[in-house]
Amino acid sequence: MKREHNHRESSAGEGGSSSMTTVIKEEAAGVDELLVVLGYKVRSSDMADVAHKLEQLEMVLGDGISNLSDETVHYNPSDLSGWVESMLSDLDPTRIQEKPDSEYDLRAIPGSAVYPRDEHVTRRSKRTRIESELSSTRSVVVLDSQETGVRLVHALLACAEAVQQNNLKLADALVKHVGLLASSQAGAMRKVATYFAEGLARRIYRIYPRDDVALSSFSDTLQIHFYESCPYLKFAHFTANQAILEVFATAEKVHVIDLGLNHGLQWPALIQALALRPNGPPDFRLTGIGYSLTDIQEVGWKLGQLASTIGVNFEFKSIALNNLSDLKPEMLDIRPGLESVAVNSVFELHRLLAHPGSIDKFLSTIKSIRPDIMTVVEQEANHNGTVFLDRFTESLHYYSSLFDSLEGPPSQDRVMSELFLGRQILNLVACEGEDRVERHETLNQWRNRFGLGGFKPVSIGSNAYKQASMLLALYAGADGYNVEENEGCLLLGWQTRPLIATSAWRINRVE
């Protein structure tokens, strides 16, 4: 702790006289003479208030002073009341100083203890609120992370509501308050709040995040880290592959159309499974769709090397598109009657919802090629409503669960995974119109869309459910994950909240 004392040292010749004069002057001014001798200026009338603040400070420092910043500067400690107040403010960032020019009293944001408390906070929270014997309205020190956490959530929601009402002045004040409250939190809550606060700030100040083709390779790289750090993508690939393998069980030629190839992480496992088929491996054709033709071709070459090594005949076709709605049937080179066709989409279809009519056009294209199965993995969330505050609230709960599931020992994969999810949050909160591409919908909403598009559901099956559950049991932190079967679809969730859903579809031939 750094303290800067603004005392001026008097010369030796006048030191004694000066000290006595000071005591007399201070006593005449009603300042307590005993504290003056110790170098502190405290009026007798302020003694009760100072005693109250000192009691608060003693409580705060009860567990040590390790939480004080090394860069803290306390000015003029001879002003005991002001010095203690500054100490309390530094220790507790939730204490908001009232400014004469401030139009909004942000201290009114409510809160109550609902978040899990750690052992350190439990010890301190017993002495969190101290009531003065002289007044029941004295300020209190709120250091309990539970209380601050609830205040943080209320501040985020209040800011989102101000944005919805286009009250940008209030929103500006609230988003700054959110940053202050978030700084006192730790773990997943702090990270989630920081991303949502940044999204709100970008929306308020109109500094929108980019989501263009130039950044697609970076997003693909982040997705690799997300794949490594948690089971969500592994679950998506495994369950989709199981559904595809059931359809390909006896086919001699098979064709997979991947709507978002990225780094091709899904297909080595499928190629190996086809190689082990009792009746021998089929000829395997893969059509990979993505943004960069060069990147797609490189992934195809690597998969071809793997297939050759394990004895699977492999053919690859690359297609570069900026939007899946631009896909045409003739691009896919379908060979009717000669091959079994599967279409695969992992976290791709929701992006089509940013462009009116695109999803209907796309489903019409897929229907025209008559695949034997279409596997779809999407976020289990409703982030595509018309009311901003509703979307914000739903996404805050959704990503809080996701970030909570990522908590663990620090690693590069975890940090990059958080950035991967953070970019989604920024797009969801800050952007509108065609720029807002993170438009997640629930499984029931996708059921309605596919039903109207001429598709019917295919049950993924209990075998995939059992194997997915076994896969999760081997994963670190598996106790928090759960697999749920819902009308032939499989959902993976954290604690009690479903987070992603895998479904399978085929053409409804009776329409």
Curated annotation (Swiss-Prot):
Short sequence motif named VHIID, residue ranges: 254-258
Chain positions covered by the region annotation Disordered: 1-20
A Pfam family: GRAS
Heme found in the keyword field: no
Annotated GO MF terms: DNA-binding transcription factor activity
UniProt xrefs under SMART domains: DELLA
Short motif LxCxE motif, span: 157-161
Annotated segments matching region Leucine repeat II (LRII): 298-330
Gene Ontology BP, a term: cell differentiation
UniProt keywords, alphabetically: Developmental protein, Differentiation, Flowering, Gibberellin signaling pathway, Nucleus, Phosphoprotein, Repressor, Transcription, Transcription regulation, Ubl conjugation
Region (PFYRE): 341-427
Disulfide bonds: none
Positions with biased composition (Basic and acidic residues): 1-11
Sequence segments annotated as region (Leucine repeat I (LRI)): 150-204
Quaternary assembly: Interacts directly with the GID2/SLY1 component of the SCF(GID2) complex. Interacts (via N-terminus) with GID1A, GID1B and GID1B (via N-terminus). Interacts with the BOI proteins BOI, BRG1, BRG2 and BRG3. Binds to and coactivates GAF1/IDD2 and ENY/IDD1.
Protein family: Belongs to the GRAS family. DELLA subfamily.
Protein name: DELLA protein RGL1
